[in-house]
Design a protein with these regions (language model features):
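Structural signature of the two symmetry-related core transmembrane helices
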Residues: 72-87, 165, 276-291
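Juxtamembrane intracellular "pre-TM" segments in multi-pass secondary transporters
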Residues: 180-215, 238
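Short amphipathic helix-loop junctions that connect adjacent transmembrane helices
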Residues: 25-40, 229-246
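Multi-pass alpha-helical transporter architecture, strongest
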Residues: 3, 172-178, 370-396
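Cytoplasmic helix-loop-helix junction between adjacent transmembrane helices
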Residues: 99-139
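C-terminal transmembrane helical hairpin of 12-TM major facilitator-type secondary transporters
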Residues: 275-318
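A membrane-interface helix-boundary motif in multi-pass transporters
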Residues: 153-166, 355-376
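Conserved MFS/SLC helix-loop-helix module at the cytosolic interface between two early adjacent transmembrane helices
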Residues: 55-93
Length: 396
């Protein structure tokens, strides 16, 4: 594995760890800075601000990386993330924490640039495997983050942010001296209209051959929000799980998913192609959602982990298919749009998921899982529009 890829993967890991470490300590942190008042509103604002900033700035950073190169945008994002962790570690005021989360949302948009960098340095036939590695690293980061937050937060509430700042600072300096540029900056005069976050979305809308795949991408984001949103609620009501079972089940799912993405995506893609791997993943994910709907014993909740893990091979294959249809000088813009759409799905889907879950559980508690499976089935006609990958440029 080359040095550049290691730096990019460490950036992805630190982003995932940073996103996860705040959740175990955020309620106590808000109680500390507010003096014990009602934290509900401030808690919601901090989560919403993060998601909105990520939605707005993902396409902006992606487009800027197409114009000026990936390296400077990544370095700027890493510096911003370091500043955010320091703000979160020492801020005595609630509104400053909100500003810190806004900054975190902006800098977390560097995932779009990291994905574009991987696309730049990876041959088309190996992209699914590389995106699978990225998914595995993210899964491990989301497991490690809450552990760091919970364990170190018990020692000192702010200490997880200092640890994250340390790792991020080290990554910044390693990237500064080791990370090469993956593409040259584009010629021409910079125009401020390039900072318009809606411009890449307009570009996507005008790029008709890409729309079916991007629609599938959004469906994936909506469906993936179901377990992420209701897993704890469902486990408690359906299986009677306590916090130990919750933590154990999340670890089992995270580790099995990471292993599948790290070790299965490459072989499956070589054997069946990206489209075949996508279909395999959708099949097993649909089977997993259907199985969860009918699971009524605790062990069944664990037994579906391999199905969800196999379902996880679909997203790297889909990312590879999407990148193969866009020219090299538009990969940053593409990844920015994809990240922005996933952020939007992350804002909307939890609201819809909880609404469906609570409105249907009195009829049948497993309904929400069948809704996820049904979304895959409704999207299946779009797969018929997907042909063999071809790189295509579009100036919009």
């Amino acid at each position: 594995m080359n040095k550049a890829l290691i730096v990019i993967l460490s950036t992805v890991a630190i982003d995932a760890i940073g996103a996860g470490l705040i959740f175990p300590i955020l309620p106590e942190l808000l109680i500390e800075v507010t003096g014990g008042g009602d934290i509900g509103f401030l808690y919601g604002v901090m989560l919403a601000v993060y998601a909105v900033m990520q939605f707005v700035f993902s396409p902006v950073l992606g487009a800027l990386s197409d114009r000026f190169g990936r390296r400077p945008v990544l370095l700027l994002s890493l510096a911003g993330t370091l500043l955010d962790y320091l703000v979160m570690a020492f801020s005595p005021l609630g509104w400053v924490l909100v500003v810190g989360r806004a900054l975190a949302g902006i800098t977390s948009a560097n995932m779009a640039v990291a994905s574009a960098y991987i696309t730049d340095i990876t041959p088309a036939e190996q992209r699914a495997k590389r995106f699978g590695t990225v998914g595995a690293v993210m899964s491990l980061g989301f497991i490690i983050g809450p552990i760091i937050g919970g364990v170190m937060g018990a020692w000192w509430l702010r200490s997880p942010f200092l640890v994250a700042a340390l790792f991020n600072g080290l990554n910044f300096f390693i990237a500064l001296f080791v990370l090469p540029e993956s593409r040259k900056s584009s010629p021409g005069t910079f125009a401020f209209k390039e900072l318009n976050p809606l411009a890449p979305l307009v570009w996507l809308w005008n790029f008709k051959p890409l729309l079916p795949l991007v629609t599938v991408y959004v469906v994936f984001g909506l469906v993936a929000a179901i377990p992420g949103t209701i897993w704890v609620l469902y486990g408690a009501e359906r299986f009677g799980w306590d916090s130990v079972h919750m933590g154990l089940s999340l670890s089992v799912f995270g580790i099995s998913g990471a292993l599948a993405q790290a070790f299965l995506v490459g072989p499956l893609s070589r054997r069946f192609g990206d489209l075949g791997t996508l279909m395999i993943g959708v099949f097993f994910d649909t089977l997993a959602y259907g199985s969860m709907a009918f699971a009524n014993q605790s062990w069944m909740g664990y037994a579906v982990a391999p199905l969800f893990a196999l379902g996880g091979v679909a997203m790297p294959a889909l990312q590879s298919l999407v990148t193969s249809r866009v020219s090299d000088d538009q990969q940053g813009q593409l990844q920015g749009v994809l990240a922005s759409l996933m952020s939007l799905a992350g804002i909307v889907a939890p609201v819809l998921t909880t609404a469906v879950f609570f409105s249907t559980k009195s009829l049948w508690i497993g309904t929400i899982w069948l809704v996820g499976a049904a979304l895959y089935l409704l999207a299946s006609p779009l797969f018929a529009t997907v042909s063999a990958p071809k790189t295509e440029a579009n100036d919009g």
